[in-house]
Amino acid sequence: MLTRRDFGLSVGALVAVPAFAQGVKVLKVANTAGVMDAQQCFVTCGQHPKLNFYKQESVDVEYVNMTSITQALQSLMTNQVHFGPMAPGILLPALAREPSLDLVAVYEWLPRNANVICVKPGSAIKSAADLAGKRIGVRNQGDPGIVVTKTMLAELGLKDDKCEYIAIGDGLPAGAAIDNDRVDAFVTFDTAAARVELVGTKLRYVPLSPKFNQVGSSWIAVPRKALKDDRKAYVGLFRAMAKSTLFAHSNLDAAFDAHWAVYPESKPKSKTEDEARKEMRFILKDRKENWMRRADDPDQRFGASSLAEWKAHIDVTAETAKLPDLAKQVDANKVFSNELIDEVNQFDKEAIIAMAKGFKVS
């Protein structure tokens, strides 16, 4: 469990018991970024006492660092966390193979596609189609990079049977693997790629396949029973998260300040504040917009999903995961739920934007 003062406990130290403090329900989140820094400000800024978005809803958040979405799935299954990010390409096969896995996607927190294809500047890879038969770097073997590659190649009528997926980690190790030609491409999230650039590795970004580029990247999944039993807490959680996301998008520097005030141990010790701020702006240069819905999205509600996008994910996953009966095994109407979304969006968005623009930590 990662509290605001202690980032040292392992997942194995957790117990599956609800946490309460002065009438506030503390909900544990699987942090698949694997690092607790201001990248999480789109959630954590609302914990600042001047904002108190979570306490106003009688909830709070604790982070549990994970190495992958696969680990987050396992932690949800064993009730070690209350909610966690989930990619359709990982969630759908799990639901098909384990019918008793009663998870539901309730909040789309990355409504744009935050996946990227990175190569060395001089690489011959110019499009997603060129990934076929190549050595693909991924953060680890449980990372969505594998599913993402399979999905794009399937869209383009290609197979990945000759691709080699190589775990290269994050940051410096990933950069070294790219620089030393251990992999031909790195398929990862926007923030992970930015961290590789920060260690000095030069990258060129290759466009995603057209259809895949139009879908969201990640949802938050919760156990269905927990959703039923603690519905009010989850509404409050996601409303506070929506407010925090809008706040961070409206004033990223203020969100950094709020995050560092709440989690002072996460502030880099080897950098000046200006250096830390500049670095974090670079990490979130693309992610900042991926938090928000596209302007042409007909549903502008924070967290909303659509039946059409989940049916599309099922169709693609059936092919990439070699599960031809997936549409029969997983009901698209049940894998996600918008039941909380109207209540989640019941807040004054202009007031949050104004609050962000005028925010001072002290």
Indicate residue ranges for each PLM-predicted region:
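Conserved C-terminal helix/tail region of periplasmic/extracytoplasmic solute-binding proteins
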Residues: 307-362
